[in-house]
Amino acid sequence: MNRMLSRISPSATTMIKMDHTHALMTFHRYHIDTPPSRKRAIVETLALALDVHAKLEEEIFYPAMRAIDPDLVEENYAEHGEMKRLIEELRGLRPADRAYDTTAMNLMRVVISHVAEEETKLLPDAERVLGEQRLAELGVEMTRRRMQLVAPHAGELAVNSVRTFPAATAAITGVMAIGGYLLARELTRPSGWRALTA
């Protein structure tokens, strides 16, 4: 498993950047006029992603960075605290509440600030000081921990991911999945691949 993880895991800094991109893309689906059930799904998807991201940084990445830039690491812990507070506040509200949109936008402001700070200061420092090998090792640790954190929420994550897409996108995705399944089934038949390549 370690050998396979080391081949498929991104470096720690790449993984963090990917998490940032995922959070921003998820939040981009949130609009004031979005139906309440979709707003809730977007927020829950974002909340889980941010929770996993924060745990990975706090348990693995920040301890490795503490000796390099302890003040910046402490600032990031504080930003995580603010994100967690806003997520809990959102979970206590209904999407139809006026405060829901305001709180969601405040969460996004904190996330954007956090992303900007990490990607312009902390991550470049990590790449410069820790080096490629250590970042790869941290990436493997973070991948292993991510799998542990996400596994209990796989069903919830899948349902909320589908709910966050507009109906047309979900329909197209469904049709593509069915098409992929049918193609795979055809290709696994003894004559399937030969018929396609003949």
Regions found by a protein language model. Give the residues of each.
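Small-residue-biased structural context
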Residues: 1-198
